[in-house]
Amino acid sequence: LVLVVIFNFSCTDMTQKKNPLLTPFTDLHETAPFDKIKTTDFEPAISEAIALHQAEIDSIVQQSEAPTFKNTIEALELSGSKLSRITSIFFNLLNANGDDEMIAASERISPLLTEHHNNINLNETLFQRVKTVYEQRDSLSLTLEERRLLSETYDGMARNGANLEGEARERYRELSNELSRLSLKFESNVLKATNAFEMVLTQKEEIAGLPQSALDAAAMKAKEKGHDGAYLFDLSYPSMIAFMQYAERRDLREKIYRAHNTRCVGGEFDNRDIVIRIAEIRNEIARLLGHKNYAEYVLEHRMAQNSDRVYNLLNQLLKAYKPTALREIKQLQAFAEKKEGHPVKLMPWDYSYYSTLQKDELYDLNDEMLKPYFELEQVKKGVFGLATRLYGLTFKKNSEIPVYHPEVETFEVFDEDGSYLGVLYTDFYPRSTKQGGAWMTSFKDQWITREGENSRPHISLVMNFTRPTESTPALLTYDEVETFLHEFGHALHGLMANSRYESLSGTNVYRDFVELPSQLMENWLPEQEFLETFAHHHLTGEVLPDSLIQKIRNTQRYHVGYHCVRQLTFGMLDMAWHTQTEKIEDITAFEQNAISPTQLLPVIDGTLISSQFSHVFGGGYAAGYYGYKWAEVLDADAFSLFMENGIFDKKTAEAFRKNILEKGDTEEPMTLYVRFRGREPEIEAMMRRDGIK
């Protein structure tokens, strides 16, 4: 490390001239120069940025003045801006456009970053300065946001080993380095295992039941892979879901189900030992830091506060929703037997198929009826238009802003008074270099600079939506439109941020609070007033008929029990991994024991959730998956206020903006929520919405 630092300082001028990551960003709004950045630029840029950040830390530590909020806490907050910017770009590209070269680079870069952050968190002199200011906090004249930054800085260092000494400190360093490497390896394995499966079909009876849109997409994939005249299905979300919903061939549905649910179980990309080791490391870290398990360590900094409160929520929901879920499955089995004319043992690969048929029969509604009205460009206008109607925002497409892939689009976002709010990138379609799922992220967060400028954010929405085909534009399913709204809610949280400090800005909030803005946005989708603004037939321009809108509303409670219990499965499994304190010898037995209370369909030998549970073992949701349900309680309660005042009520929207979206982590989440809602959230709103109460 010392050699790297010396080398980088001696070559700074030469490196900066050649490396676009180390020179000032001069494009509009100082956006990242993606058109100039090469993968080989990242390692030297990150090495130099680490050295620059370390020099800033050294200047804080070595100063002779007594510790103050300004010379220690604020100085620490403002340090490392170049490193933060470069690493945000790198890891976002790794997830959205991560080829083999990027993955290999990440395996070299991540240990450097972990070591660097450990060097800061475990710097005893730095922590003593932070601790001195923290202990004086009641005698200092600090603003609310400054007090929050002080508290978060102290807690952040303490929770990352700063209070440890001697062998415990070194052990923490070793464990965090290993954890970083394993999390990266886990994600890499999931992506590679997902890309490894392809099912090429050539016979007409193999594709029976599939709609033309799915066949067109599969034919295009097959052609790209050299299988002219065939149909290729894989484990990308649009391809897999269409097949599971519509394919009549039960054996082929089973084949895809098994392929998806045995990913990273055995073979070249086996994650089982990695999962066990990650859980073991997290448990040891928690013990080192004085907690009985990793869940207690995590939840100390969450709205839920402890695992008892999490389990109380999960068990309360399980008790309320499981009877409905069991009834739904029983009715679905009866439907399947009636359809087939003989007894049917409902298996996991049957659920999507028969539920799609049942839903169609009960409500005369399916995705193929709705997709012509959900053309992506129109949906985009509708989603952006909702932000205009609620908050007065406008979105101006700007093709001059550089992008990291030709399919990415960029928009300048402006407030109601015409002032610039931020940049929004959209990246909608699957590709082999992109992780599955959907997410919002940022290339730059909002903050107030040293010069007092409100530096606005650069936000990105990354999806895996159904691609356009040679004959049709991109037509979305209802669920994909809902996903768009969900991630757009996160985007608004980032775009409207108005905090002084970057670490407290936008979505940098507790995990069980961060899903409130995203899940709230989903509530508008079934509302007729909203649907009529954008749901127009892509060929005729016809507005989505009232009859279909009513059918959408009628289906809102379809299998609400099943879907809730399904989410509880993930929440229970996550909590089981992070409340256990012994090494797991049999990962399959452990998983089955954890999720047995939520099982509604037969367990299939060889399948495993944990080996591909990216939220928890590759992302930031460890001991946090319950947060989706926690936030659902919040979003139902929050939307009930919009229902009372009018779903487009500007005053209610303004209250949500001022008290939630703009505030970030500047105050405790419950304080902010109560200020918006006038009281604490009540679970009854969610249960009423779902027809459970």
Regions of interest found by a model, annotated:
Residues L1-N8:
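Bacterial N-terminal signal peptides
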Residues T15-I37, E48, A230, E361, ...:
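C-terminal, non-catalytic "cap/extension" segments appended to globular domains
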Residues Q16-P211, F642:
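N-terminal helix-rich structural modules
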Residues T26-D41, F90-I109, T132-E174, D234-D273, ...:
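Short His/Asp/Glu-rich catalytic/ion-coordination signatures at enzyme active sites or charged loops
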Residues K82-N92, S151, D155, Y351-K359, ...:
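Short, hydrophobic/amphipathic alpha-helical patches that form generic packing surfaces
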Residues L149, R181, S188, K192-D234, ...:
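Active-site-proximal, well-structured secondary-structure segments within enzyme catalytic domains
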Residues T466-L485:
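Short pre-active-site segment immediately N-terminal to the catalytic Zn-binding motif
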